[in-house]
Amino acid sequence: MLNIMEVHETNQMIEQEKLDVRTITMGISLLDCASDDVDKTCDNIYRKITTYAKDLVSTGKAIERDYGIPIVNKRITVTPISLVGASSCKTSEDFVKIAHALDKAAKEVGVDLIGGYSALVSKSMTPAEELLIRSLPQALSETDIVCSSVNVGSTKTGIDMNAVELLGHIIKDVAERTADNDSYGCVKFVAFCNVPDDNPFMAGGFHGVTEGDAVINVGVSGPGVVSRALDAAKGKDFEFLCETIKRTAFKITRVGQLVAQEASRRLGIPFGIIDLSLAPTPAVGDSVGEVLEKIGLEQVGAPGTTAALAMLNDQVKKGGIMASSYVGGLSGAFIPVSEDKNMIDAASSGCLTLEKLEAMTCVCSVGLDMIAIPGDTSASTISGLIADEAAIGMVNQKTTAVRVIPVEGKGVGEMANFGGLMGYAPIIPVNQTSCEAFVTRGGRIPAPIHSFKN
């Protein structure tokens, strides 16, 4: 039974502590849209998305109005397009046509982003998957809200180094084609290892082939709520600290569960999962970095940062998992540099380095995220970053990812501005010592010995 104090507390979390539902994401299967003609495939895709998602935005706004809970984004994920377009796309330009169809359909229904222009190549690439990857520079530079991801490895299969090597060149090409906008195209692309099928967040969201015809997934956000709660834990021991984070994560996730079930009921589409992630914004007081600093660090990046993040991530999961019948996606604490005020400050001061961020990815929910690097960084160096992150994910049986932006025409210390939720970031140095002979060997890195569980 709710009491009036709990109602007041929830209101305070929304009004003063920036609690919001970051996204309601509708996943839609496009497997039945495939044909042997690319124009017909595009028509099928457009028709299915605009039919299934026609009420998504209005329903999100109605739930916002009825419950007083801010819902920041409404999004769509679709089946990886490398699968949908495999029979009809004979060139990279054919895949770009599908990207335009996705962009047009998403704009028609009014969503903020659409994800799933993706390929799953953790062992090797089919001809269609390679065509899609090679189409990325044109697709991401010519569309506005289409997001893309490529899964290059997994604990079970190892790492596809041919794909990793290719992606270094692709990311450079995307950066050059969108140079007039601080290489914004790279914001819409992420390389994964152990990618989840049900991620509601972008740019890595897609509708997995193990999913049904359509599903509603919800991502919550509440670093500001956790930060405010930690004011009461100042000077207390770790037991008190952990309990505070856990209880707060439970309350945050309960809000997401309510929104997910209500959206599912109103849209007549099954509820999938709640993603428990703490997703920051560039606004003051809505920062994962601030939470880490309240745990006891002078600034993010100081010794102890990785341990503090590991503890935060674990307590968020432990608290959140009790508040929802189904959890999934990435679920943990995000560390996107450009989207987090305190991390922006730490990177600007030099306290938070790329190497420290890599260490933090061993224990956070994803990986190297929204990091601006010099525009003259080589393709092989970017491939090396992807390989390092994929190795961390593969060996530790966790999801890792790389979303770096080599900002064309800018160097260390300059600022890149991506706007809105994507924020802004100082360009940080990257070790330029060559790894080209390593990433160009070809083939794949085998799966680790502990992957053999059968």
Curated annotation (Swiss-Prot):
| SUPFAM superfamilies in the cross-refs | PFL-like glycyl radical enzymes (SSF51998)
Instruction: Check the record and name the InterPro entries matching this protein.
Output: UPF0210
Pfam families named in the record: DUF711 (PF05167)
Q: Which domain of life is it from?
A: Bacteria
Query: Entry's NCBIfam families?
Result: PRK05313.1
Family note = Belongs to the UPF0210 family.
Subunit and partners: Homodimer.
Q: What is this protein called?
A: UPF0210 protein Blon_2054/BLIJ_2131
Cite the source lineage. Answer: Bacteria, Bacillati, Actinomycetota, Actinomycetes, Bifidobacteriales
